[in-house]
From Swiss-Prot:
This is Protein translocase subunit SecF. It comes from Rickettsia typhi (strain ATCC VR-144 / Wilmington). Coiled coil: none annotated. Forms a complex with SecD. Part of the essential Sec protein translocation apparatus which comprises SecA, SecYEG and auxiliary proteins SecDF-YajC and YidC. InterPro entries: SecD/SecF_arch_bac, SecD/SecF_bac, SecD/SecF_CS, SecD_SecF_C, SecD_SecF_C_bact, SecF_bac. It is found in: Cell inner membrane. The gene is secF.
Length: 308
């Protein structure tokens, strides 16, 4: 039995992506500026990982219904509430932010009353701690360093595998994706917490993967078509990898959609941000990182690009 490959576009498709180069550049610059301006004015909706808050440790007589408990506590109107087990399924950590110290005891009483009225458990409150914002500043610095090191590692990898100007194209695309992701997070008021930093790093990885696939085909076509100019080669390479790109983005979005619908509040911000980032990363790999190579069209491509 013969197996045919799954394709979403015709084999001989020849869509002129490069014809939209100036439009895509202008569109991306406008979106990036809007994102930066919005972030500058409205900032982020920082979660308790960054602004500090209260940590309540409680032991229950049996395993709690965490999804229901999250829903009940989130409806209290005291901001983000994070619940998670530690040590055992009977031990629960409840974390929430507080706008002022005056509200601390009031919010603690609200939570205790809500738990007592809505759940038939025996609660043993073992510890109540205040987590200051200085911890949040440390986490912000750690997150920024994580993104910086990921950029540097990617640049080294691309420089070794291709050439430095390929790395330049990917760097521009990554900066574009991160700015749009942060702008989207600010506009939609998604919680800025440790999971959203993980989401940004996931977006970076996805965008690089998409761009490397196209770059690899560009390098291969440079070997095959010596008489074609760089614009034709880039167009050809994007079209040849288009079916793979569409298949990858659809399957990844569907998997991520399941997380958005069924993953619960704990990973909601992560899932929504990754969903947006996958779309942005796919766009940037086609319309930004590849067309940027035409900047070097008037230069002779290094032999190492063709020989590798």
């Amino acid at each position: 039995m013969q197996i045919y490959p799954l394709r979403f576009v015709p084999n001989k498709i020849n869509f002129d992506f490069m014809n939209f180069k100036k439009v895509s550049y202008s569109f991306s610059i406008i979106l990036s500026l809007i994102s930066l301006i919005w972030i500058g004015i409205y900032k982020f909706n920082f979660g308790i990982d960054f602004v500090g808050g209260i940590v309540i440790e409680v032991r229950l007589d049996r395993a709690p219904d965490l999804p229901k408990m999250r829903a009940v506590l989130s409806a209290l109107g005291i901001g983000e509430v994070v619940l998670q087990n530690f040590e055992s399924e009977h031990d629960l950590s409840i974390r929430f932010g507080s706008s002022s110290e005056e509200n601390l005891m009031k919010n603690i009483d609200i939570i205790k009353t809500s738990l007592r009225n809505n759940f038939p458990y025996n609660f043993e409150y073992r510890k109540v701690d205040f987590v200051g914002p200085q911890v949040g500043r440390h986490l912000i610095e750690a997150g920024a360093m994580a993104m910086l090191f990921s950029f540097l590692a990617i640049m080294v990898y691309i420089g070794v595998r291709f050439e430095w100007y390929f790395g330049f194209g990917i760097l521009i695309a990554l900066v574009h994706d991160v700015i749009l992701a942060l702008g989207f997070m600010s506009i939609t008021k998604l919680d800025f917490n440790l999971s959203t930093i993980a989401a940004v790093l996931t977006i970076i990885g996805y965008s690089v993967n998409d761009s490397v696939v196209i770059y690899d085909r560009i390098r291969e076509n440079l070997r095959k078509y010596h008489k074609k100019n760089i614009t034709e080669i880039i167009n050809l390479s994007i079209n040849e990898t288009l079916s793979r790109t569409i298949l990858t983005v659809i399957t990844t979005l569907l998997a991520n959609l399941a997380l958005i619908l069924f993953g619960g509040k704990a990973i909601h911000s992560f899932s929504v941000l990754v969903f947006f980032g996958i779309i942005a990363g796919t766009y940037s790999s086609i319309f930004i990182s590849a067309p940027i190579l035409t900047i070097f069209a008037n230069r002779k491509f290094n032999k190492k690009v063709i020989e590798r």
